[in-house]
Regions:
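A generic "folded-domain core" signal
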Residues: 1-176, 192
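Short acidic, glycine/serine/threonine-rich helix-capping segments at coil-helix boundaries
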Residues: 161-164, 174-221
Length: 221
């Protein structure tokens, strides 16, 4: 945390939040790192949970301190996940090119990140192809700030919204003079552009997404 503070990164609970711009297109980038499994005497590497937005793609990555043997036919790892006191669930996460972890990318990452927004802890078990297990339980204190930063940079909302919800938001934007076209419940480029214009008008970050702060400003509960 001392190094993160010196580097000017935000700190929220167990998370450090680094902001930058992509070299290829100047799009906003966020790397949020959960340090709750940090061990000062581990010189081989650290176990960490990383939520990030890089060049418009969201990822959630479980980083391990060992080199791992994945399922080469599926290029993935068997995972056991448990959020707070909920029943555990089985999943498969993609292997990393570094061979030191596994992750979810794109819409899969967005969906899972939404599911831990209000959680206090996350247990992960990664199983190598040889059966060796790697367990970690992360304290998620401060995760809402980290998740909102990642979602804002990649232009998605941390809320689980239905088609009817999106249609209602589009109707509100049209009524306020921010044209989305015919409200259809699909959050496409026209809706994103209209939302950005509204966000600028009320002094909010231009995410283009119906995020929590924007919906509160719109009067949507």
């Amino acid at each position: 945390f001392e190094q993160a503070n010196r580097d000017g990164h935000r700190i929220s609970g167990w998370w450090t939040i680094e902001s930058s711009r992509a070299a290829v297109d100047d799009s906003p980038q966020i790397i949020a790192l959960n340090h709750s499994q940090f061990q000062a005497n581990n010189f081989m590497g650290q176990t960490a949970l990383v939520a990030r937005c890089i060049e418009g793609e969201t990822a959630l990555v479980f980083v391990q301190d060992d080199f791992l043997m994945n399922d080469y036919q599926r290029n993935s790892f068997e995972m056991t996940l448990r959020i707070d006191d909920e029943p555990s669930q089985q999943a498969r996460w993609n292997s990393l090119t570094t061979n030191k972890g596994a992750g979810l990318f794109g819409p899969e990452a967005e969906t899972f990140i939404r599911s831990i927004y209000d959680a206090e802890r996350l247990f992960l078990r990664l199983v190598e192809s040889n059966g060796q297990q790697h367990d970690a339980q992360f304290d998620l204190a401060g995760s809402q700030d980290a998740i909102e930063a990642v979602a804002g940079a990649c232009g998605w909302t941390t809320l689980s919204l239905s088609t009817d919800d999106y249609r209602a938001i589009q109707t509100l934007l049209n009524a306020g003079g921010f044209d989305v076209g015919t409200p259809d419940g699909q959050w496409g480029p026209a809706s994103q552009t209209a939302m950005r214009a509204y966000q600028v008008s009320v002094g909010l970050p231009e995410t283009g997404a119906p995020d929590r702060a924007t919906l509160e400003k719109l009067g949507v509960n």
